[in-house]
Curated annotation (Swiss-Prot):
It holds the Pfam family HSP70. One of its GO terms (molecular function) is unfolded protein binding. It comes from the Bacteria. The keyword Transmembrane helix does not apply. The modification Phosphothreonine is found at T173. Residues 577-591 have a biased composition (Low complexity). PANTHER family: HEAT SHOCK PROTEIN 70KDA. Belongs to the heat shock protein 70 family. It comes from Lysinibacillus sphaericus (strain C3-41). Residues 577-611 are annotated as: Disordered. The gene is dnaK. Acts as a chaperone. This is Chaperone protein DnaK.
Amino acid sequence: MSKIIGIDLGTTNSCVSVLEGGEPKVIPNPEGNRTTPSVVAFKNGERQVGEVAKRQSVTNPNTIISIKSKMGTAEKVTVEDKDYTPQEVSAMILQYLKGYAEDYLGEKVTKAVITVPAYFNDAQRQATKDAGKIAGLEVERIINEPTAAALAYGLDKQDQDQKVLVFDLGGGTFDVSILELGDGVFEVLATAGDNKLGGDDFDDAIIEYLVAEFKKENGIDLSKDKMAMQRLKDAAEKAKKDLSGVTSTQISLPFITAGEAGPLHLEISLTRAKFDEITLPLVNRTVGPVRQALSDAGLSTSEIDQVILVGGSTRIPAVQEAVRKETNKEPHRGVNPDEVVAMGAAVQGGVLTGDVKDVVLLDVTPLSLGIETMGGVFTKLIDRNTTIPTSKSQVFSTAADNQPAVDIHVLQGERSMAADNKTLGRFQLADIPPAPRGVPQIEVTFDIDKNGIVSVKAKDLGTNKEQTIVIQSDSGLSEAEIERMVKDAEANADADAKRKEEADLRNEADQLVFQVDKTITDLGEQITEDEKKSVEDARDELKKALEAGELEGIKAAKEKLEGVLQPLVMKVYEQAAAAAQAAQGGEADAGAGKKDDGVVDADFEEVKDDK
């Protein structure tokens, strides 16, 4: 069976892992790094992903970052006059991860386990699955990030019974999950979180502080300057990372903007104490979900055996201190917070292929599910923290006499009124036979599958007529849209390959043009006027083809020039060999050896000159 890769599709960075010899292994990207920035950029119609996209983000306005925060929404990103859904942009990142995983494994990859924040709702989970499909991946399972982390942590500790609290603060989302581990069973007891809290918010707090300080000193508001804000974003992220290791850092941005008197520079020293002060409200927001999860699990902090920190933002000292204070535990430091989620996803992939035996994962739904009933009330059918997969039915009736149809409004959330919760979708059960209100029996059934994705069925028990929908939210993509995006993604992959082929061909052609001039110089008077004219004409033809930029034309001109140049190159080699033989005064065999040496030396010389 082909391998199932594990992907942590993060807000700031993504990571891909695979199970090798029963152990999860992180696959490095082409630059050799173990995580890849979740950044996509467009330049002159060309698409860039990862490190290269992030490096030029300051100067390229067509750069997309933190797209994960838009997953499950109908919001689109417009770049170079084209609209992209969050699913399409995420698919570009997934396609890149898939590509270098294939290079590493030496085989095609078609299946993946992708992680999502535990607090992702149905629309966000469905969007993630769609992104995988667009990228050419069969998403075998969507699993929660804290659960994946616990899976990687507990794989070699199956002989121990323990209760684990996973504190996951990533680039854009925050989750807390409490799990019970024992005898190969990983059971989630409770989960809580905040989908609008992460490392990006800590960066924004620093940016706000820098903008305010600069305005105070120079009277100029940098928040209106797009380029300055991008430079501030990079500087804030770097300062945040620095302050995890040192108590003070210097933020220096020369020529950040221009005033009446000329260019202005930003020079500010940021201490860890100041950073802690401006980010205190964010740190405090992590406390509520921790308490909520403990309460839902029916546990006190003394009953927690281990606290695992996940996500790059847990490196912030104030965050670690808040965790210590709230749990009365020293966090476990045996896992890499940036990689453990992808590794857990790879373990889950191994469970699905049968490579990992005797592991059972019992996850939960993070939010309650129900429907709107009379008076705009939210009636729950499945409570939050219910183990999935699950199914639940309840019988409802009509609100008016002779009501011909029932509108089913499906919601997810914890508030008592429907309007305050997240709408997952609406559908209608029609053709109900005329009857007084309260008489028809309408059975509504909720199903949540192993990926946390919801489907709902309504059935008229009198007529046995039923209507089923897999929830399709406003942001959901139809099969036709997904199919179109899959084709676009494949076309882009082909276009990228074609661009690479074109670049390689151009380089070879440029090298050949240079070689012509060098060969003419090396031969000096040994070359006849006819030979010289013939090779120069072929060279000029190739130069014109390069300017025209037509691939087939370049190929044809290059082949023609190679044919004309070959005899002249042989002349140069023979000349060099003869000169070497004369100098050595050697025998014929030795001369032949020198001729070989000449070939190698000339080859090396040319490559050096080209560089």
